[in-house]
Amino acid sequence: MADRRRRRRRASQDSEEEDESASGSESGRSFSASRKTRGREPEPVESPAERVAAKSDDESECVSEDGVGEAVLSDYDSADLEENGSHTEGGEEEEEAEHFSEEEASRPAAESKPVADAPTEELVEGEERDESVKEVKADEKGNLAGERQSGDGQESTEDPENKGSKGQKLDDDEDRKNPAYIPRKGLFFEHDVRGQATEEERPKGRNRKLWKDEGRWEHDKFREEEQAPKSRDELIAFYGYDIRNGTGPSDGRSYRSRKPRHAGSPSREPRRYREGDKSVRSSWQGPPPGHRNAPQSVTVQSGQPLAPLSAPKPSGRPSTQPPQRSFQGSRAPSAPHRTEGRGPSKPSLDGAPLRGPRSQPVEGERGPRLRGRSSHAVHADRSPSLVVEDICSEEEEEEGEIPTATTTYTAHHYKTEKERVPSPRKQDSGMVMEGGSAAGQVRELSPPQERQVEKKSYSRARRATRTRPSDLSKQASLDDSSSAVQQAPVAAKSESWQEQSEAGTQSGLTGLDQDLARLSLTGQNWAQNPPSYLQAEMRGIRGSMHMAGGPPQYGNMEDMGVGGGRAKRYSSQRQRPVPEPAPMHIGVMEGHYYEPMTFQGPIYTHGESPAALPPQGMLVQPEMHLPHPTHPGLHPHQSGGPLPNPAIYAAPPVSLSPGQPPPQQLLPPPFYPPPGVMTFGNTNYPYPAGGTLPPMYPNPQAQSQVYGGVTYYDTIQQQAQPKRSPPRRSSNPVTVRPPPPEDQSRKAAEEIRS
């Protein structure tokens, strides 16, 4: 209590002194003077004895107060003074501190005197104190409004600006103390439009715009005037062709050749347009697949090819041959069709319309071709390129996906090969094909074409296989074709065999081919299609043997694949084999172009798979297979599919007819998976194309043997070493051994828990 009183008294004294003093410095001095006088005022009243007693009290009081308390008091006092705003100068504060320390002794005496002596004095002092405190408070409120008072309860919370308008009631959004206060100043709030929203009336009616353009983002490129349909000229200016044309650019753009390797539905869809697009497809003959369309489109125009096709169909090859010559000497109208068919996508477009006619002409061609084999003239007419194209287009039609792949990849190869081969065939047949001879030379020059040849043969074989069934029905309808073809196939086949032997493919193969020819002859329909197919297969076999032996095989294979019943192919093959290192190419092609596994799987799926396999160098064997499926008696020893399995690697040669080259087929076509897939008459034979896969697919090999009733080994494919890739695949799955570790870790964790 005493301490509080003292503090109050000091505060009042200070304020009084401040009032008295005129300036800050003066007030500091007057402080000390007035305080000293005040402190001394009571002293005269005190008696000496009381003074002594007061002093002793003082000391006892001051020990607590002066020792520690003095500093504290002086702090409090200075704080009070500061709080009250009575002192604004540091000098004053220092003086006050000194004063308080001096006054401490006298003040306790003054207090103790009233307590001990006279309550009246105390009352008088108390009154003085109260008055002074009131004055100080009034002064503070008047002079110090708006200044922060630190924690003494006198702080003013209101801003000085708002103090004047204290009485006015503020809106919630303007009252800063209200949570609903909306700031109106500052960068962040310049976009705060709350409360300013004014609904603008939008035009009503049918044609009203749903948005306004004033506020439209600049990057919004929508222009109403651009929404109308564009004219054809505009479209062509924009995209380079009329994008509304369902067939795509029909100007023979090379990009058209970009067909999925599996020419399945894509090629079939285009078949509808094949007649129109064929010209583009015919470009196949030309450069690589990319350029096929443009070149061939020039060479073969839909009108021309169709007319020749229609003519040749009924008449068989004879009528077709001249048109072929007209096309390129080596290309028959059917060739253009096939070429078109081959065309990556266009062939498929053309395929639909041409399919019926094409298959018939093809059959007719085949029949004539078979005859033509006897008379190389037919083959010559259909230069290898023509033959290949025919087969490809047919295959594409029937086996949309695979042919496309073959066509796409081998298209340029075929072209080259065709160019090469035509001359040989033509020469052999005695027919002089200007284009053909040139092509033949080109083929001889370029070994890679042999790959193409193989692929050609593959596509042809496949097409033949595929088409054969369809062709059989069609051929049945063709009296000429069926009878002539049947008769011709034997002769053609025998000639083919002879040609093959001439080519130096394999005498054994020749025998096998002959057998196959006989088998194919057994059924008229089969005779027509199978004979050509078988011949193609036989050629393929020879080709595969050649592949083992050298390029000649390829030439033969190509011929076989291309013209199952075409003499041209044979002759061209014979000629090619020597100059062309087909085996390597075949292996490479098969290896790099079609993974034996990958490629053959799809091929089988097409049911033309046998044909597809030949391009891989297994084509030859597939040809053998075809005969077997066609004529199980042909190779009775091979009929035992399971037996070929064991022999697939080493014994396969034995299982295969003597004509077949077993050693070459070191790698049995392991990929004869879908016997059912081979939906030829020869569904049995799995194509050796999978030969490369033997290591991985020994069982498939067995299947192929079982299916063909003959052990089929693709020597080239076997030689090709893409087979190693399958093991990698198997290794990946095998590598999945993390699960057991997980179990162990779980067990360990369980043990730990337990």
Swiss-Prot record:
Record localization: Cytoplasm; Cytoplasm, Perinuclear region; Nucleus; Nucleus speckle
Entries under InterPro entries matching the protein: Btz_dom (IPR018545), CASC3 (IPR028544)
Biased composition (Low complexity): 22-34, 481-494
Bias kind Acidic residues: ranges: 58-68, 119-130, 391-401
Protein name: Protein CASC3
Organism of origin: Danio rerio (Zebrafish)
Biased composition (Basic and acidic residues): 39-57, 131-142, 160-178, 187-235, 268-280, 414-428, 743-754
Keyword RNA-binding attached: yes
Chain intervals for the UniProt region annotation (Disordered): 1-511, 709-754
GO biological process terms held by the UniProt record: mRNA splicing, via spliceosome; mRNA transport; nuclear-transcribed mRNA catabolic process, nonsense-mediated decay; regulation of translation
Family: Belongs to the CASC3 family.
UniProt keyword Nucleus, yes or no: yes
Skewed-composition ranges (Basic residues): 1-10
GO molecular function, one term: mRNA binding
Compositional bias segments (type: Polar residues): 294-304, 317-331, 470-480, 495-509
UniProt keyword annotations, A-Z: Cell projection, Cytoplasm, mRNA processing, mRNA splicing, mRNA transport, Nonsense-mediated mRNA decay, Nucleus, Phosphoprotein, RNA-binding, Spliceosome, Translation regulation, Transport
Summary of the function given for this chain in its UniProt record: Required for pre-mRNA splicing as component of the spliceosome. Core component of the splicing-dependent multiprotein exon junction complex (EJC) deposited at splice junctions on mRNAs. The EJC is a dynamic structure consisting of core proteins and several peripheral nuclear and cytoplasmic associated factors that join the complex only transiently either during EJC assembly or during subsequent mRNA metabolism.
